[in-house]
């Protein structure tokens, strides 16, 4: 009898509460204990009993904080506040934003609808990753994106629009860093000079990156060449744009499982970024495997051999004998003089080449248009091309000089033979008269 009386009282209270129009205020007891003891469910069935309706726990779309309360019931609280708090605590441990902050609530709804950003993310912590923003005083922590920072989200997940005044530089070698619109012009002008090779903050170009043994030297006289940071930067820049595999071959790095990653990490320490999976831009030649020091050494030795050992005199004498016709001697001499002048002009042009090589940064002499073409050729040949052509021109000029000397000898011999023949003829005439 006591059990039936208690259950009847419980049913009457439930029916009275349901008839009074309350919005399930009994659920506030969940804040005290989610697993409180319940009375025994032993009661007599009643035909007029209507149990209260509880909505099923299906997933509902999240509402913004400004819409968390219904407009028709401003005086009532959220009946599922405790349940939602428990659900978010287990499902989304990184969501710790309280509901009692109306300022951030309105900001979150505007940012979520306008920029299609995840409302649980906050990019205010990225200002420390951008040196340009911290220096200029323009940080994302003061902008409309400052909500709550989550450091495990990457910068590439951002979807920024032009209306927010923020843009992202997308190049293969330059890391994607958001910059403010005020600094766009200055940074873009600096990046346009060095395409997809240089990152702001590159260390001293004259600093030695590593020492590389030569490929062309004998085992008895092996020499090492110092590779500077500037040379590594030139190998990563156009026109070659070497990848990690080719650059490792140039630097004589042994192949290993993580060799490319180790090389990229070392390059990042000096401010250079070598992306994985990069494709080379130029064809690979034998000169690609040479560092600039060895290429210049090869060009210098080639120039020495051309100047001292090239058979310029023998070649000139042979060709002069091929063209010994007295009627062509004058015209041929004029052609040799004109060719010598043209060759001298071209050699003087190459002597004014100021392409970057090693740790030297000479001042420019030629016009930028001509110098850029010569620099392109020098970068492709790692500094061997220009000195090698000058050495070949030196050998050709020596041939021209020997040819002119041979022409002068022919002229002298021809004029000498003419004088002797005239003298003998005059002597014969005198004897005949006698």
Curated annotation (Swiss-Prot):
Residues 52-62 have a biased composition (Pro residues). One of its GO terms (biological process) is regulation of cell population proliferation. A motif (PPxY motif) lies at residues 53-58. Residues 30-123, 415-434 are annotated as: Disordered. Residues 422-434 have a biased composition (Basic and acidic residues). Coiled coil: none annotated. The keyword Nucleus applies. Binds DNA as a dimer. Can form homodimers or heterodimers with other AP-2 family members. Belongs to the AP-2 family. This is Transcription factor AP-2-epsilon. It comes from Xenopus laevis. The lineage of its organism: Eukaryota, Metazoa, Chordata, Craniata, Vertebrata. The gene is tfap2e.
